[in-house]
Amino acid sequence: MGALQGIRVLDLSRVLAGPWCGQILADLGAEVIKIERPRVGDDTRMWGPPWMPDQDGNMTRESGYFQCTNRNKYSVAVDITTPEGQALIYEIAKTADVVIENYKTGSLVKYGLDYASLSELNPNIVYCSITGFGQDGPRAEEPGYDFIIQGMSGLMSITGEPDDVAGGGAQKVGVAVVDIQTGLYSTIAIQAALIARSHTGRGQYIDMSLLDVQVAALANQGMNYLASGKAPQRMGNQHPSIVPYQTFKAKDKEFIIACGNDKQFKDLCIAIGYPELLKNEKFVRNQDRVKYRNELIPLLSEHFLQKTAKEWVDMIHALKVPVGVINSIEDALAEPQIVHRNLVVNIPHRLNENFQTIGSPIKLSDTPVEYHHAPPELGEHTAQILSRFKTAEELAALKEKGIIDGKIA
């Protein structure tokens, strides 16, 4: 039994931030009913290549993107732009605990699927809206995109090499980190609202914004600006407050050192056979190493060219100084620690019994995450869910009219 067993989620969201939230809730045991457009589905179904291979290695039309964020969900294909489709959503909403949606601000009002409308049907509902800029303010009605928010929030201003370095300039993060973080924050907010409901007896509205989330996630960098009045700048892989805490080039490739305190720096110097650095007062304390990083880093950089990355990593690791390699994703998923922690899981899939996905990182002792089913086919569960309040004949008629899609009989 999952931790959220008995919680029903009506998921009207698409693409990533909302579906990521829904998948976490589904992994934790909630029944997540994903509403999709008939014959089209979630936009990300067609965001390939890469496409998922079938049992014989042939490419299907199932995108890798969709597969990463929709496991454990029930796909119901309903045209919410029609009165008949809206009536179906109302029936689901009557028994739902949670609604997730990520339409533009106000877009669902015309369909009667906004919080005001659904909370009249079900006052206990927790309704989470995810938008680019929130429900109010001068940009509230604009659509939001992860890449745009990375730029607007200041994240890209501190990501990448400085302008005066070869290849310098603002960079986005390699995954849609704003969407992912918003999905995480939304999950936290939903669970908090469910607990609050157990005390108050009523649901509530949650207003989540991509921009709000990423500004909050600036964390120490945002606080550094508020404390100093100076905007942090791009420093490549260096840390603004800790030295050495960056990548270094060995004889063959780069590796990472992350000295978090003065003792670790002392041990580093011993490990790499460079104890004379400790005789320089500029390098003994971290605050001085930060001040004189332009003197220390060239010395270390030249020294590290003498051996391979593996040699340095083994030597430094022996003295328990934080050090690591830079893996490709292929190497990361084959990393023995990742294998031991079962981060790559097999889930039976209608097209490939050897379907693999990256699993949940949540490890619960009494109510562990379970993988009930692979990401669904479009409309795979339409009949299963809608038959709770519609007859087979009624469903067949709705499919004939194009109101619903999927397996009916």
Question: Locations of the language-model features?
Answer:
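Flexible glycine/proline-enriched surface loops and loop-helix/loop-strand junctions
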Residues: 168-178, 249-252, 367-370
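Glycine-rich beta-alpha junction loops
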Residues: 39, 133-134, 210-215, 252, ...
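Flexible, small-/acidic-enriched active-site or ligand-binding loops
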Residues: 284, 352-401
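Oxidoreductase and adenylate-handling cofactor-binding alpha/beta cores
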Residues: 161, 183-203, 216-227, 269-276
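A glycine-rich dinucleotide-binding beta-alpha-beta segment and adjacent secondary-structure elements
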Residues: 318-372
